[in-house]
Regions:
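Expand to "…catalyze enediolate/carbanion chemistry for C-C bond making/breaking, isomerization
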Residues: 2-530
Length: 530
């Protein structure tokens, strides 16, 4: 039975109010959600509509370039605000969902910072979202603990700096409406965390720090900045207290990195190279280009032309503006009981971080506590006792728009690559429908970006004349359906237990990858099912 709570006028909540939820869903916290919704929802909707219009132009053949109207910002001599002390050193950042055990292990991992996630590594059902807020409130106060399977989990004296990723602009919180409209998932996550924790964090010498996902333009960054200004005033903390690192994980945002930093310059803590979603974004934005087709996902590394151009431009842009540049995810995880495979995987992490550190990045992401020492070692080799290398200006890097659009490699596309996309897509979606958004699959820690790349590549290969396997077979809807049947059986064997979500996942994956239309985000229709 739901615990009774007092709601602001015009607000309705359909999610169950479990015992303890009333400490998060307080009248004052919900009033902040309602106020921010009323102030900014029309702009959010206008920006989402602008995405639709831009997509139509891209579908008609338009290609992005650096904006003529913001040339003065790109050429100006401005900097972002000085960083707070506990965001100066971010050599290794660990990421993971807002789940209690994960939070404790990540904060204790030895990483400099921990991005705790309401977004891609979290299945956003109501319980996960509100339990996540409870967990973070306890973590901020250092009271978080857990007794599980005979083990006791507590925080160490020294913990990582906490950074919170709310949901992106495109996602709603379906359980909460204001004046009959669903509220933004991002504003809901952000406002509840800020209200309950901003002053406590400041008192402990830190602050409310965020990661902002999935933005496609500097106008979307401007909206976040305006939300920050209004929210800081509402909760009574100084302007500029909030800091936000923006994930550059859409190809359109890569053309507006200076402008995004400029919009958030009072509140910026740099940019991050969100590599997996970036690849998905490229496929999505140029899906109708018959000449555009990428090879197997495993071949699209950070060293291929368009990814290398994006990584170097991000680095150069950040350091020019005195902002940290954080490298992307190493999704590899330690492999038990296979020393040879484990050595190879750890070698991959090492070379990944070595390249980032040598290029000039100030830190990078890992998905597992076991990778923290390896990543740390590579950054310390380059940084020594310096907290970052923002002073390393990359004036030698000259990137033009065409470099960001140099989509290679186109081959090989293999049966193994196609089957892997189908297998991983079904496996991840099934876990997501079952409430888990962070899933180890084939020795990689996968989140929603993986499923997005998988299904969008399959969709593209079916439609592109270049979607031909290296053995000469054309990728067709029929071939995908045939492989999907077999891969569903493989997934069911590997997961055991309740396989019903995986049956549903296979149907969704097949429908999305073989249908004529392209679904913008698979999490949008899926969210209605959880």
């Amino acid at each position: 039975m739901s615990t009774p709570i007092t709601l602001p006028q015009g607000m309705a909540i359909t999610g169950e109010i479990k015992p303890g939820y009333e400490a998060i869903l307080t009248p004052e916290a919900l009033a902040l959600v309602a106020a921010l919704h009323r102030a900014f929802e029309p702009r959010r909707q206008a920006l989402l509509q602008a995405r639709v219009e831009r997509t139509k132009r891209l579908d008609a053949g338009e290609r992005p370039d650096f904006l003529a109207e913001t040339k003065a910002i790109r050429e100006g001599d401005w900097k972002v605000a000085p960083l707070p002390a506990d965001l100066q050193c971010r050599r290794v950042e660990i990421t993971g969902p807002v789940e209690r055990k994960m939070i404790i292990n990540a904060l204790n991992s030895g990483a400099d910072s921990y991005m705790t996630d309401f977004e891609d590594s979290n299945a956003p059902n109501w319980t996960n979202q509100i339990d996540g807020q409870i967990n973070l409130k306890d973590a901020v106060r250092r009271t978080i603990s857990l007794e599980q399977n005979g083990k006791s989990y507590r925080l160490n004296d020294k913990v990582a700096t906490l950074i919170v990723r709310p949901r992106g602009w495109h996602l709603d919180e379906k359980h909460v409406t204001v004046d009959g409209q669903r509220v933004s998932g991002g504003i809901f996550d952000f406002a509840l965390f800020l209200f309950h924790n901003a002053k406590e964090l400041i008192a402990r010498g830190s602050g409310p720090y965020f990661y902002l996902p999935k933005m496609e333009s500097h106008l979307e960054a401007r909206l976040w900045n305006d939300v920050f200004v209004a929210a800081q005033e509402a909760v009574g903390v100084p302007r500029g207290t909030i800091r936000a690192t923006v994930l550059i994980e859409t190809i359109l945002a890569a053309f507006e990195m200076d402008e995004i930093l400029y919009e958030l310059r009072e509140h910026s803590s740099g940019l991050n190279a969100g590599r997996w979603d970036y690849i998905f974004s490229a496929i999505k934005k140029f899906k109708n280009d018959r000449d555009f087709c990428l090879a197997d996902r495993s071949k699209i590394t950070m060293t291929v032309p368009f990814m290398r151009a994006y990584a170097l431009l991000l680095l150069k842009t950040c350091h020019k503006r005195n902002a940290p540049a954080i490298g992307g995810m190493s999704a590899l995880i330690p492999i038990k009981n296979d020393p040879e495979a484990n050595d190879k995987a750890m070698g991959g992490v090492r070379s990944d971080k070595q390249r980032d550190a040598t290029d000039g990045y100030d830190g990078g992401w890992v998905a597992h506590p076991g990778l923290v020492p390896i990543a740390m070692e590579e950054f310390v080799k380059v940084l020594g006792d310096r907290p970052n290398q923002i002073e390393k200006q990359r004036d030698d890097v000259q990137i033009e728009g065409r470099n960001l659009l140099d989509f290679q490699p186109e081959a090989p596309i293999t049966e193994a690559g196609l089957r892997n996309n189908i297998n991983v897509g079904i496996h991840y979606l099934g876990a997501w429908l079952d409430g888990n958004g962070c899933v180890p699959i084939h020795n990689l820690m996968e989140d929603a970006a993986t499923a997005e790349i998988s299904r969008s590549q399959v969709w593209q290969w079916i439609r592109s004349p270049k979607g031909v396997l290296d053995d000469g077979r054309k990728v067709t809807a029929e071939l995908v359906r045939e492989f999907a049947k077999a891969e569903l059986e493989n997934v069911k064997r590997s997961v055991g237990g309740n396989t019903q979500p995986y049956e549903r996942a296979a149907a969704i994956f097949e429908q999305m990858s073989t249908s004529e239309g392209f679904t913008e985000f698979l999490t949008l229709p899926l969210y209605e099912e959880i």
